[in-house]
Amino acid sequence: MAYRKRGARREANVNNNDRMQEKDDEKQDQNSKMQLSDKVLSKKEEVITDNQEEVKIADEVKKSTKEESKQLLEVLKTKEEHQKEIQYEILQKTIPTFEPKESILKKLEDIKPEQAKKQTKLFRIFEPRQLPIYRANGEKELRNRWYWKLKKDTLPDGDYDVREYFLNLYDQVLTEMPDYLLLKDMAVENKNSRDAGKVVDSETASICDAIFQDEETEGAVRRFIAEMRQRVQADRNVVNYPSILHPIDYAFNEYFLQHQLVEPLNNDIIFNYIPERIRNDVNYILNMDRNLPSTARYIRPNLLQDRLNLHDNFESLWDTITTSNYILARSVVPDLKELVSTEAQIQKMSQDLQLEALTIQSETQFLTGINSQAANDCFKTLIAAMLSQRTMSLDFVTTNYMSLISGMWLLTVVPNDMFIRESLVACQLAIVNTIVYPAFGMQRMHYRNGDPQTPFQIAEQQIQNFQVANWLHFVNNNQFRQVVIDGVLNQVLNDNIRNGHVINQLMEALMQLSRQQFPTMPVDYKRSIQRGILLLSNRLGQLVDLTRLLAYNYETLMACITMNMQHVQTLTTEKLQLTSVTSLCMLIGNATVIPSPQTLFHYYNVNVNFHSNYNERINDAVAIITAANRLNLYQKKMKSIVEDFLKRLHIFDVARVPDDQMYRLRDRLRLLPVEVRRLDIFNLILMNMDQIERASDKIAQGVIIAYRDMQLERDEMYGYVNIARNLDGFQQINLEELMRTGDYAQITNMLLNNQPVALVGALPFITDSSVISLIAKLDATVFAQIVKLRKVDTLKPILYKINSDSNDFYLVANYDWVPTSTTKVYKQVPQQFDFRNSMHMLTSNLTFTVYSDLLAFVSADTVEPINAVAFDNMRIMNEL
């Protein structure tokens, strides 16, 4: 094993004081090792400035001799004078530079698998309710009767389509639909049981209590409740629990139990869950030191590839997705360590440039902006942008030749597609007109805006020098290779970049350029270019290592991406300063950094959770669109369905998404098939709409309208009301058909002939129990409204309750007044609660444990970074 002597590459001219300061700094750094490791592992990144190294200066000065302390103080004084221009870093200190937009990062990391929520109750639409019974004279009896009523009767008053209620109900079912049910977890004690038996959930227990305490309950039913308990079949790992459910609720819960998404979990599944490239990477040592029980279960994540093709014509949405991926990626790219001391490197560069008082201005620019913060920032930006396929734009100054020469390295190792076209053309044109063409004495390139060829493509055809033309050819053809790995489309770098060989090609071209005569340029110009090339060529070994390090980190993190990496130019770009590229090239040390296993697993889990949630929300949206279509609500609800879909993905600012993309998204969603479970659930609702309408206090099955007033009748459930329980003797017209055709002539003719008409179809009604308001409304007949407006949807039939509970009841009794109404609500009787028909036995596994984080069972470690190898089985960084 090769060992490296710390500080071996520092220059010979660094004096003893600097060495002593370095040793003291290393001691200090070791003392704060735990603090640094905490900062590295923390999710919140921060910029570490140089002020921390001065905290214990006083203690260090006391330990040294008087003479050494004087020299040390002089060094510190000199450093303070240059602090504005130069940042000096301690060796082995990490320099995080990126402060993520924590809101987006938190939204991404907070997306958890839905199965994590524990089911404590069965799914129910109905609940049994006691209602009073009224005598013929309107007085309430002491007896009660049990009926099935809706738990959430959420239909609002007024002009509201009942079909919207069913769409909202379906949406509620989809939201509450469990991925698995374990009845043992929700079972509660039956208080009335003789032998401490259990029933399936707390609502069943409360219903049993209420029935048991009801004076009218038969003795046989009470005895049955006392016998209610679970039945265990241990040999089959099965348990049966008694439950009290409406038949429709029983159908729902039985379906959920039969179609659970849990699957058996074993070590092989966990092993295969880890991305294959990480399993096969010799730098990572993975162990599973636990045998799972036979009852272990997991829910397979839904990782279908993007069925909406968001990269195609969804510029705003795609920009948001790539931005969030970029922020996530930057948080997991490792920080560079042991960068070359900025001060020492600038001193060495100054020596190489032979800077003197009379040096031309251009060469002093070479040193501006070089610091380790920029180098680390550049490293993270390049890898994160490639992982998220974010387009980058380049910022540079044409007169800073060092930036342009560094840009030549950048264009060599990063595919052209990663840069916005305008920025790429500007950078290439600057390199051609500043370095390449002057070297050969060629005239400046006059580039026409909009030319399909880039400046490098034009230059490749015109330059005769083989090495330079060969390098230009490589850059012009440097594209990602699209490779499908484990069913995911990956954007892979060229092999010459991965192994670093391309840097030799770049250096050959640079050396050829530096040997040219620059015939049309002054000597100073030629010297500046040559010295800039010399600075970069002196670091050939480090640049090869840097390129290999960049490629390795990119490909290792790419293994954790689960969605196809589609390459499309993004609306916004990530800015990259070429001076930061210079910093990276000049300051890269010889310390290898690779992602920690914990970071990789975290990155993989966040990607899986977002991808799975994305697919589940697509399935929900497709199901709701299909339901809206079948309920004839397609036009009315479409935009809100798409908006809800985007909101549930967490990362989108829905208000800012352009309408054209909303409608394009709607069209794509319409073309997708409905998932089987969601379709079956909708069919269950559709088949039982009549029962659900009956159980609602706000939905009627029709309305009877007449020209003359109709007398109120006694109803057993409400007293005196304008409710009709059957339509015998009335002419019937279908409400849906009437609204579709808009032909009201038939109604008008019947009413003019004094024949009441029954309009049949689900519609809402407003409850009003005041007799005074009834008298006030008698003048405005519904008939007048229909003839005038010809709109049935303005019809609001009113349910009037006049009984012994009403404040106005005695008014009726005293004045012998017979209340009447021009409308009657047709309302079918809700289903009566029958204990025997509502008793169901539900069956599930006796026990199983669902694990949501499969990677928690894997213990992982890495080899010593210095020994980490790349794909070619050679050390990532060889320049020791």
Curated annotation (Swiss-Prot):
The N-terminus binds RNA. It is necessary for encapsidation of VP1 and VP3. The N-termini of 10 VP2 molecules form a cylindrical hub underneath each 5-fold axis of the inner capsid. It comes from the Viruses. InterPro entries: Rotavirus_VP2. One of its GO terms (molecular function) is RNA binding. The keyword Ubl conjugation applies. Residues 1-45 are annotated as: Disordered. Keywords: Capsid protein, Inner capsid protein, Repeat, RNA-binding, T=2 icosahedral capsid protein, Ubl conjugation, Virion. This is Inner capsid protein VP2. It is found in: Virion. Pfam families: Rota_VP2. Its main location: virion. Residues 394-414, 422-442 are annotated as: Hydrophobic. Residues 1-80 are annotated as: 5-fold hub. The record marks A220, F224, M228, M839, M841 as: Interaction with the intermediate capsid protein VP6. Residues 19-30 have a biased composition (Basic and acidic residues). Belongs to the rotavirus VP2 family. Homodecamer; each decamer is made up of two conformers of VP2, called VP2A and VP2B. Interacts with a VP1-VP3 complex. Interacts with the intermediate capsid protein VP6. Interacts with NSP5. Interacts (via N-terminus) with NSP2. Inner capsid protein that self-assembles to form an icosahedral capsid with a T=2 symmetry, which consists of 120 copies of VP2, with channels at each of its five-fold vertices. This capsid constitutes the innermost concentric layer of the viral mature particle. It encapsidates the polymerase VP1, the capping enzyme VP3 and the genomic dsRNA, thereby defining the core. Sumoylated with SUMO1 and SUMO2. Sumoylation of viral proteins seems to have a positive role on viral replication. GO terms for cellular component: T=2 icosahedral viral capsid; viral inner capsid; viral nucleocapsid.
